[in-house]
Curated annotation (Swiss-Prot):
Name of the protein in question: D-alanine--D-alanine ligase
Gene name linked to the record: ddl
Pfam families (UniProt xref): Dala_Dala_lig_C, Dala_Dala_lig_N
Cofactor(s) recorded in Swiss-Prot or TrEMBL: Mg(2+); Mn(2+)
Lineage summary: Bacteria, Pseudomonadati, Pseudomonadota, Alphaproteobacteria, Magnetococcales
Function: Cell wall formation.
Catalysis: reaction(s): 2 D-alanine + ATP = D-alanyl-D-alanine + ADP + phosphate + H(+)
Superkingdom classification of source: Bacteria
Protein family (similarity comment): Belongs to the D-alanine--D-alanine ligase family.
């Protein structure tokens, strides 16, 4: 559809822990679309969003919201109710992918390789017992992650029970549920997919430690290799095949990013899908698009062109 004659709202900011990143993503999309001559308004989302959308006469929404209330199907459902087409996955796909436990169960049921994990709620006594069970089955490092946040907010890498318990407490401070996931040693890769088209793989190489929030959004903390070097054809094909399968199984559309670990034997392990990838100057999806000659204005326009209801 041609959106040139429509009033476009870039929805950004919001109420989650990822607000600051969202503001940067939204600003990048706003500038890109404005440079192409679109009628675009940047809207910082709060609890009065319905009134703002009506007042501004928004006819299509470009979503740059990260985390809860933005990537979990909430804003998508509101826009469906208001009859405003929007970018990215629909309500169901957004909810599935935002819930790391739910999406991993779906991956596992469909035969897609994903690291072993357990899920924990706010009951610390139960958490202690489950961590003991996890340690009985697996040795070495694990990652503790909130089940419904992105941008590596609240994530810890832990070895041993004491670190795991501290990691669980940290994760539960930002969410009422978390998971302990077996750490797979290997290369960190990410695959950006736009409307079913896979972009070149990126290898993520943190200067030190693991790829946490600071490494993601602080210049100079991480090296990004585009395309990922020294990948044999078999591993490359496997990553793309698994990423596209996950994209379709979850019902995704638009721009989505799949994160992987490639172990020492060349086996890719699917970690998660990100349904509204970051669009900042350090973000991965724009880097992958650039590698195939798609600059930010064109990427923003392609994202916009995929806007729809349901």
């Amino acid at each position: 559809m041609d959106w040139k004659q429509k009033k476009i709202g870039v929805l950004y900011g919001g109420l989650s822990e990822e607000r600051e990143v969202s503001l940067r993503s939204g600003q990048a999309l706003f500038v890109a679309l404005q440079s192409l001559g679109y009628q675009v308004v940047a809207i910082d989302v709060d609890r009065h969003i319905t009134k703002v959308l009506e007042r501004e006469g928004i006819e299509v929404a470009v979503l740059a919201l990260h985390g809860p209330m933005g990537e979990d199907g909430t804003i998508q459902g509101l826009l469906e109710f208001m009859g405003i087409p929007y970018t990215g996955p629909n309500v169901a796909a957004s909810a599935i992918c935002m819930d790391k436990g739910l999406s991993k169960r779906l991956f596992h049921s469909e035969g897609l390789p994903t690291p072993a994990w357990i899920e924990l709620a706010g009951d610390h006594e139960e958490a202690d017992e489950l961590v003991d069970h996890f340690l009985g089955d697996f040795h070495g490092a694990a990652f503790v992650k909130p089940l419904d946040s992105g941008s590596s907010v609240g994530i810890s890498r832990a070895v041993g029970k004491d670190e795991l318990i501290r990691g669980v407490a940290k994760a539960l401070s930002v969410s009422h549920r978390c998971m302990v996931e077996r750490a797979i040693e290997g290369r960190e890769l990410t695959l950006s997919i736009l409307d079913g088209e896979a972009f070149p793989l990126i290898e993520i190489v943190p200067i030190d430690g693991f790829y946490d929030y600071d490494h993601k959004y602080t210049a100079g903390r991480t090296n990004y290799l585009v395309p990922a070097p020294n990948l044999d054809d078999k591993s490359l094909e496997a990553v793309v095949k698994i990423g596209l399968a996950a994209y379709h199984i979850t019902g995704c559309r638009g721009l989505v990013r799949a994160d992987f670990i490639l172990d020492g034997e060349g086996t890719p392990w699917l970690l998660e899908l990100n349904t509204i990838p970051g669009m900042t100057e350090l973000s991965l999806a724009p880097k992958a698009a650039h590698a195939v000659g798609i600059e930010m204005p064109q990427l923003a326009e392609r994202i916009l062109q995929g806007a729809r209801l349901k």
